[in-house]
Amino acid sequence: MICTFGDLSFASTPAAHTSSLDEQEVTLNFFGDWAPSSGRSQIGLQHRPDYLPETLSSHLNRSDLNVLNLETTITQGPATLRATTRLFREQPSALEFLKSHNFNLASLANNHVMDYLEVGLEETLKHLDSFSLGHAGAGFDRDTIYQPYRFEKNAEKISIICVADGELGNEKFNNGVGTADVTSFRVVDQIRKSKAEGCFTIVFVHAGIEFLPYPPPFIQDIYRNLVAQGADCVIGHHPHIVQGMEFYSGAPIFYSVGHFDLYREGGRTDERLGLMVSLGLLDAQLTKVNLLPFRIEEHNINLL
């Protein structure tokens, strides 16, 4: 396996042999919360040519699968429908950025996709479908809500299960409408089913306590249990900052990758830091882990 952070690389295989494997590897990139208009007086920044650094754009374009947490709704509906401190929404045109930068999957398992209730969720699903963008982790019935996103390439089979903790939009509080619950037995069922079908199984989780630099013990227990049930990797987001990672029973757990783009004027310094987690797969095994750190600025995103 190769583990990298920025430009640092640690390889367990000779460089020449590693290069010969690169063409066969399947590369997956994961990002945290994306709500580009949140906290900004100027919207539509994602359409600026300098919004992303060239290196990050290159990673996206070369990757086989790019995944983020869509921490917002895509709706042109009423100004407010849910009593909460902050309501997030983007115009459908925001999805042009995801499509043009080779994103394949938007996780909807989070605490903002239901900000505009069922109407907002329905519109979000409609607009994602209109851009041919995959989505998982939310819906109008439990079979759909807990259905993993499946991806296959070069004989690699990947299953991504998108789940969240028990906030207002969770399906367990809304009669089976809303977001997938990380503690549901259905998550374990989907992990076991995915593994039985030969999939490399990743659980993409929106959970935790905001602004804690380390995951609390109960989150560590939940994420480790996902691995114990068969998950090959767990990637977390929601705490607004980057937290630690570990290898547990051979599986990487990233407790929080921070934001992809969720800006708050006057916010904490650490909430402007994010990570791209890049995984390499070959023969159903994890061959590479690359962590690319970046900083969210008022008008764009810069690499560290």
Feature roles, as predicted:
Residues 3-304:
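Acidic, metal/ion-coordinating pockets
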